[in-house]
Amino acid sequence: MQVTTTVEETRKLVKNWKKEGKTIGLVPTMGFLHEGHASLIRRCHEENDIVVVSDFVNPTQFGPTEDLEAYPRDFKRDSELCESLGADLIFHPEPKEMYHDPHAYVSIDTLSDTLCGKTRPIHFKGVCTVVSKLFNIVAPDRAYFGQKDAQQLAIIRKMVQDLNFDIQIVGCPIIREEDGLAKSSRNTYLSAEERKAALCLSRAVKTGQEAICKGIKAEEVLSKMRAVIEAEPLAKIDYVSMVDALDMQPVESVEKDVLVAMAVYIGKTRLIDNFSYEV
């Protein structure tokens, strides 16, 4: 496995692999890898000749009061995991390598106005910009994203379609702990008490799934989910919403495929979870 830190050396490797006719898969990450990331890397390995993992804490997707400096980092552990999973390259640039003197950004209207975009207004602009850069640097045939970040996945798919990137976007299932908590790098922030409290998210998901399968109206589904979360004293709801699975706009009834998503603060840590329902 190789490690690169510059755009130039990464492009050189990619160019050689392309000359050899090899397919390239990209797994974009912010590092501090867990089993959720590992599942993406395994899938990428199954479907491509070359596996590239980007390990970059992207500053442009963090707001001024968010956890950029506190975000967990452990590149040694990340590289060992990637090597054990058969990755061919980790691209691990410094921020100044990715952003010299930036004036151009990529943003997606409408899809980024709801859910996480409502309370994190610059987040998806930063995500789309860095993912576009990675696509241009690595030129992958396929790129892999987890469905835990369902809004991000929808936005990236739309960006790829609208900007004519010749890349297949592969969404992969949410990976959970044995007790149901969705895997997240931010779980490391939680104290033992908060870790226990965080299970209200997966309980709310289960409650919502059961309710929606019974044909209960959208607002009642959300009300039941909110009640589960509000019963936990350490939890503070950012949002619990039901949106159209394609355009991320709120819906009042379940007449087409929907995404039911939530963001909840457990203490100071913001966690997300979701489920999809297909009509």
Feature roles, as predicted:
Residues 2-234, 243-245, 275:
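Nucleotidyltransferase catalytic core that binds NTPs
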Residues 219, 224-279:
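Phosphate/ribose-recognition catalytic cores of enzymes acting on nucleotide-derived substrates
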